[in-house]
């Protein structure tokens, strides 16, 4: 039985692939669960259009992520003044992803979602310059130098 997949199926293929499967597997599992449709010329044309639209969207997303990367890199180092600093230079608490996003926005950078900020494994708990990664796209990452200073 020839089918066109409408969803990613493990060990079989991804969306838009035309696959040959046993009749029982197609009739009893793939078709009832909406994971595939019967292959025909019209269905193949529709699958090709969906694949082209998905590729175009992926390319636009990658270009948009590259534009944001250039804007963030243009900022250089981003300063983050912290109010709660001990005399020894240690912070009472630590820097959060929300703090990083606010510092980038305040420095004139783009508005980012705090979930894409990747802080180092060890928490930032001291004054100084720290590298912070921002995951914009599966293929685009940018490193921001975060300069944590004591607010006066």
Curated annotation (Swiss-Prot):
GO molecular function terms listed in the Swiss-Prot or TrEMBL record: rRNA binding; structural constituent of ribosome
Superkingdom: Bacteria
GO biological-process terms attached to the record: translation
Name the InterPro entries on file.
Answer: Ribosomal_bL9, Ribosomal_bL9/RNase_H1_N, Ribosomal_bL9_bac/chp, Ribosomal_bL9_C, Ribosomal_bL9_C_sf, Ribosomal_bL9_N, Ribosomal_bL9_N_sf
Q: Which UniProt keywords apply?
A: Ribonucleoprotein, Ribosomal protein, RNA-binding, rRNA-binding
SUPFAM superfamilies (alphabetical)? L9 N-domain-like, Ribosomal protein L9 C-domain
Q: Which PROSITE patterns does its entry note?
A: RIBOSOMAL_L9
Gene Ontology cellular-component terms for this entry are: ribonucleoprotein complex; ribosome
Q: Name one Pfam family in it.
A: Ribosomal_L9_N
Q: What does this protein do?
A: Binds to the 23S rRNA.
What family does the database annotate? Belongs to the bacterial ribosomal protein bL9 family.
Give the protein name, as stated in the record. Answer: Large ribosomal subunit protein bL9
Q: Which organism is it from?
A: Mycobacterium leprae (strain TN)
Instruction: Identify the gene encoding this protein.
Output: rplI
């Amino acid at each position: 039985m020839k089918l066109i997949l409408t969803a990613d199926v493990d060990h079989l293929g991804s969306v838009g692939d035309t696959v040959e499967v046993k009749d029982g597997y197609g009739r009893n599992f793939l078709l009832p669960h909406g994971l595939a449709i019967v292959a025909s010329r019209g269905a193949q044309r529709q699958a090709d259009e969906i694949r082209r639209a998905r590729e175009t969207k992926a390319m636009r997303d990658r270009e948009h992520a590259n534009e944001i990367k250039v804007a963030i890199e243009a900022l250089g180092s981003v300063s983050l003044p912290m109010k709660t600093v001990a005399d020894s230079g240690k912070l009472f608490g630590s820097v959060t992803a929300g703090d990083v996003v606010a510092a980038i926005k305040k420095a004139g950078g783009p508005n980012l979602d705090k979930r894409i900020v990747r802080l180092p494994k060890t928490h930032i708990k001291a004054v100084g310059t720290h590298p912070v990664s921002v995951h914009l796209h599966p293929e685009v990452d940018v490193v921001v130098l975060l300069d944590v200073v004591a607010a006066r």
